[in-house]
């Protein structure tokens, strides 16, 4: 006879938990919120996530890492990686107002976890550093190919794009308007044109 499946195996459970963390932040999300959002009973939840809320949050954040890893794979095979990076940023302007208000769960985590939880903060910081390296690598390759005229070192441009990403996380909350965001994004991305 087969036992109950564990909820951890269900990708949708992690996505549902991620949505609550994204909306409320780690500190404001209760175990009750997570159980309600995921439909998991207390016993099942605690048996699956022995590390409690922190473990669920770590898995939700790591799920976002997978999205960045997928983007990195696309960059590596793209004939126009700079255009792909630009499209990535420009697509943010098309997001819904609710998505603008949520911002980026990774950047949000860095801000929220400073002085609260060093492990969670460092995990989010590492994801942003990995994205920075992804941008840096793509820029470096395009400079080598002669597809990018700027002589600014790729490491500086990679950090610039992460700085822009984190600033955009705030700007989109201030101005959740597609046209305002698109204009700002295009202006900021002129550095890699």
Q: What do these predicted regions represent?
A:
Residues 90, 132-133, 137-141, 174-193:
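C-terminal peripheral helix-coil segments that are non-catalytic and often amphipathic
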Residues 84, 98-119:
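Amphipathic alpha-helical segments used for helix-helix packing
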Residues 151-171, 187-188:
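Hydrophobic alpha-helical segments that form the core
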Residues 73-102, 154-161:
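Hydrophobic alpha-helical connector segments
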Residues 1-7:
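N-terminal intrinsically disordered/low-complexity leader segments
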Residues 61-67:
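Short, basic, alpha-helical segments at the C-terminal edge of helix-turn-helix-like DNA-binding modules
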Residues 12, 16-55, 59:
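Helix-turn-helix
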């Amino acid at each position: 006879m087969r036992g109950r499946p564990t909820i951890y195996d269900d990708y949708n459970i992690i996505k549902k938990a991620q949505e609550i963390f994204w909306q409320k932040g780690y500190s404001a999300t209760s175990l009750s919120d997570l159980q309600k959002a995921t439909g998991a009973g207390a016993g099942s939840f605690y048996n699956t996530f022995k590390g409690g809320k922190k473990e669920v949050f770590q898995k939700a954040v790591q799920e976002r890492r997978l999205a960045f890893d997928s983007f990195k794979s696309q960059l590596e095979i793209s004939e126009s990686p700079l255009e792909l990076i630009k499209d990535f940023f420009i697509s943010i302007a098309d997001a819904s107002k609710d998505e603008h208000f949520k911002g980026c769960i990774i950047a949000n985590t860095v801000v929220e976890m400073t002085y609260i939880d060093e492990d969670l903060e460092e995990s989010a910081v590492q994801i942003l550093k990995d994205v920075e390296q992804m941008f840096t690598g793509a820029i470096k390759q395009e400079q080598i190919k002669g597809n990018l005229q700027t002589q600014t070192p790729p490491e500086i441009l990679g950090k610039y794009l992460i700085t822009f990403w984190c600033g955009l996380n705030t700007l989109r909350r201030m101005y959740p308007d597609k046209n305002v965001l698109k204009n700002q994004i295009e202006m900021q991305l002129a550095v890699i044109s």
